């Protein structure tokens, strides 16, 4: 796409009177700052009349089913709401135009009005909690929505057909500098044994990309008279839900149970490999996933990188991962095969996407090379090299689009059902 022009996403209101243009759908959180949300809204002047053009950005945490939103009680908490009066521009909302806004206004004309939002760095990233097989409607989790509409004031009731709603994502990418190599060790002294059992485990690195195998090096020194009967390795996802109070949910996303034994007065060393995949965890209701924009496949939620001193109460969902290594040790004696004792260590690590490579500068498109793509709408190819793509979700078989979801948002899971 980089050699065809600057891609701009657009979405129109159902009545066709407003259209919002954004340069991207993913906005990167760099820990100390977040990329601004900048775009323009194109309004039919005959429809606008004497009203004003407003754009809002909302970060919300939905934690229950929409069909239970009755009597003014909703299972949704707005973590952040910002409003901009795009036209006529309010003095406090007027900001210098970005390069994208300048180009869009030049192309779209005088009825295109700019808007810019600054996202606070301590807000959560977009996370979806995996629904169960029978769940329908909007999934629980944290999402960001841009909404544009015309009204006399912000309190006026806005109908869906007269407004534009776009779901965007706040994302983080793996840091360029990894942390120290995760290692952990423990020593256990047993009754009736003069010497201890020592377990040491390590990972080959601290940062893993989604889909990358995790190598776990396990070293056991068994100086006891006990036998290690089994070694269990698991990758666990931890999701801290910070809402009215803080609760932690853990879920194994990859496991291996090896029948490797370690006899008394012996040592053992082996490298185990596990790869956490969402495909192997489809049935796990409430598993944290990266936020979705379309009905396309996603992945396990990325680890959350926190800024020092961040207010954890405002962070909706904090995701982390650990590898757990557990030795199942026979106690010996008459109950040796029936009773056992566990020795375990945990290794925290980071699971994320790598930072995308910077796109090369866009080249001008010669007239004879005008690209043809039925999925894109391109205007004035030779003028300013901008390509417009519909923002709406792709409709797949058995899936609902945005409008259907909003009108039939039932059956999504509640946190208490996890």
From Swiss-Prot:
Phosphotyrosine modifications at: 47
Effect of residue 396 to A: Impairs interaction with AP2B1; no effect on interaction with CLTC
Tissues expressing the protein: Beta-arrestin 1A is found in cortex, cerebellum, striatum, pineal gland, retina and heart. Beta-arrestin 1B is found in spleen, lung, pituitary and kidney.
Record's keyword annotation contains Metal-binding: no
Stated consequence of mutating residue 391 to A: Abolishes interaction with AP2B1; no effect on interaction with CLTC
Region Disordered, annotated ranges: 353-375, 397-418
InterPro entries registered for this protein in UniProt: Arrestin, Arrestin-like_C, Arrestin-like_N, Arrestin_C-like, Arrestin_CS, Arrestin_N, Ig_E-set
Consequence the record notes for mutating residue 236 to Q: Impairs InsP6-binding and oligomerization
Motif interval(s): [DE]-X(1,2)-F-X-X-[FL]-X-X-X-R motif: 385-395
Record PTM text: Constitutively phosphorylated at Ser-412 in the cytoplasm. At the plasma membrane, is rapidly dephosphorylated, a process that is required for clathrin binding and ADRB2 endocytosis but not for ADRB2 binding and desensitization. Once internalized, is rephosphorylated. The ubiquitination status appears to regulate the formation and trafficking of beta-arrestin-GPCR complexes and signaling. Ubiquitination appears to occur GPCR-specific. Ubiquitinated by MDM2; the ubiquitination is required for rapid internalization of ADRB2. Deubiquitinated by USP33; the deubiquitination leads to a dissociation of the beta-arrestin-GPCR complex. Stimulation of a class A GPCR, such as ADRB2, induces transient ubiquitination and subsequently promotes association with USP33.
SUPFAM superfamilies membership: E set domains
Binding site for 1D-myo-inositol hexakisphosphate: 250, 255, 324, 326
Assigned protein family: Belongs to the arrestin family.
Protein name per Swiss-Prot or TrEMBL: Beta-arrestin-1
